Amino acid sequence: MLRGTFVALITPFAGEEIDEPRLRDLVDWLIANRVDGLVPCGTTGETPSLSDTEWQRVAAVVIEQAAGRVPVIVGTGTNSTMVTIQRTRVARELGATAAMVVTPYYNKPQQDGLYRHVAAIADAVDLPLVIYNVPSRTGVNLAPETARRLLDIAPVIAFKDSSGSLDQVSELVLAVGDRSSVLSGDDSLTLPIIAVGGQGVVSVLANIAPAATATMVRAALDGDLARARQLHGELFPLARALFIETNPVPVKTAAELLGLCSATVRLPLAPLAPANRERLLAALASCPHTASLLARPMGEAA
């Protein structure tokens, strides 16, 4: 089971190439700021825009740079069961702690199809799994009852829920009990999800405000509601601003403004609109946990 703050890592680019030096710097900076784990090759990492070779390289670099200091959960999910099995095997060979498997997108499988998909992966590869439910992107919702059934046949150590529904998260927490963790996939809902029984977050926000995000989550899990609410209030406007356009466009723009890496995203994603860039800059300047990093030279924040 997982507990704490796990960073949904961005993938820095230098032109058309992966910016490995910035990626390594980012890993070190996040670990120094006491996050509990790293999740490369997910939605925020622009995985659908990476070649197979690039996907493997990003996973390998993060695992190598983390060097066992924190768990590394590699995104291996695709909309092909066969390809997902292949990638999960590679993640295991690279030394990943676990694989994050998103529900298959575009295909719109039934609940039985989702069950069989995860069962096939678990049968083929001996690696703990984090199941990722994000209906807004996949077109399918993993039902809490299906999640409960998966625990009987697969080593699922956590469910990442980005349904946006506290009712569903509450049902999921009740369905899985103490057999697995439930992690928020929405930064703005992290505190409420912990309040109903969640155990942490897979966080976009933690790419740029790692220490504050991790401190908020620890406070909430430790029962320090006053501290958790204070940090939630300080971080909430920025968390919302990171979704003024499609993720990860805003968070990569924020990373550039904070001197962490280039804002470059790959097509079909486009750069942040100028008006939204100004809104994002205002949110960064207003947040006490990012304001001091603004205008640093590239790489200095790391």
From Swiss-Prot:
UniProt EC number: 4.3.3.7
Give the EC class as a word.
lyase
The protein's UniProt keywords, in alphabetical order, are: Amino-acid biosynthesis, Cytoplasm, Diaminopimelate biosynthesis, Lyase, Lysine biosynthesis, Schiff base
What's one GO BP annotation on this UniProt entry?
A: diaminopimelate biosynthetic process
State the compartments where it is located: Cytoplasm
Binding residue positions for pyruvate: 44, 202
Q: Where is the active site?
A: 132 (proton donor/acceptor), 160 (schiff-base intermediate with substrate)
| CC terms in the record's Gene Ontology section | cytosol
Which reaction does this chain catalyze? L-aspartate 4-semialdehyde + pyruvate = (2S,4S)-4-hydroxy-2,3,4,5-tetrahydrodipicolinate + H2O + H(+)
Gene3D superfamilies in UniProt = Aldolase class I
- What does the record give under GO molecular function? 4-hydroxy-tetrahydrodipicolinate synthase activity
Subunit structure and binding partners: Homotetramer; dimer of dimers.
Task performed by this protein: Catalyzes the condensation of (S)-aspartate-beta-semialdehyde [(S)-ASA] and pyruvate to 4-hydroxy-tetrahydrodipicolinate (HTPA).
**Hey, which family's this protein in?**
Belongs to the DapA family.
Q: What is this protein called?
A: 4-hydroxy-tetrahydrodipicolinate synthase
